[in-house]
Regions:
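Internal alpha-helical transmembrane segments of multi-pass membrane proteins, especially GPCRs
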Residues: 28, 61, 103-106, 110-113
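Mid-bilayer segments of alpha-helical transmembrane spans in multi-pass integral membrane proteins
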Residues: 71-77
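Hydrophobic alpha-helical transmembrane segments
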Residues: 46-53, 126
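Alpha-helical transmembrane segments of multi-pass integral membrane proteins
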Residues: 34, 69-70
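Interfacial loop at the N-terminal end of multi-pass membrane proteins
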Residues: 1-41, 82, 86-103
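Juxtamembrane boundary at the C-terminal end of a transmembrane helix
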Residues: 125-136
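Core segments of transmembrane alpha-helices
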Residues: 36-48, 64, 112-121
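Interfacial segments of alpha-helical transmembrane regions
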Residues: 50-69
């Protein structure tokens, strides 16, 4: 959320070559380090779907579905842009369509963020309902 609200608008003020280089190096590390957290989120939600009580299983299934959709959108829309920016940053090459690529990446982010929000909200509702049942 930090980068969406602060980093991205700040980078828009920088020259396109600088923006491409910075985003390329961010993706160089992010694309290697972030998948483990996504895998753990998917796995934990899958386990909750399989082993939770039937009352809350729907919320966990909704959460898992949102995460799967998030990964599909990332893989189809964001990852190819990440690769282009990373390759450009590594080689010092300038991308003629850098602004359009970043705008496309930002649009894909605006699709993915609500999916994460719905996933977290579904988990919260399931947890809240479970906690409420304990205290009744």
């Amino acid at each position: 959320m930090f980068f969406l609200t602060v980093g991205s608008p700040g980078l828009r003020l920088a020259p396109q070559a600088t923006s491409t280089e910075v985003m390329g190096f961010i993706h160089l590390f992010g694309d290697k380090r972030m998948p483990i957290w996504g895998i753990l989120a998917l796995l934990s939600n899958l386990l909750l779907v399989l082993f939770s009580g039937s009352r809350h299983r729907t919320f966990y299934l909704l959460s898992l579905s949102m995460l799967i959709l998030f990964v599909v959108i990332y893989d189809r829309l964001s990852k190819p842009i990440n690769r282009l920016q990373t390759a450009a940053a590594r080689t010092g090459r300038r991308l003629d369509n850098a602004g359009a690529l970043q705008a496309s990446w930002d649009r894909s982010l605006m699709m993915r963020v609500p999916l994460l929000a719905v996933s977290m909200l579904a988990q919260f509702i399931a947890l809240f309902c479970s906690a409420s049942a304990v205290f009744e």
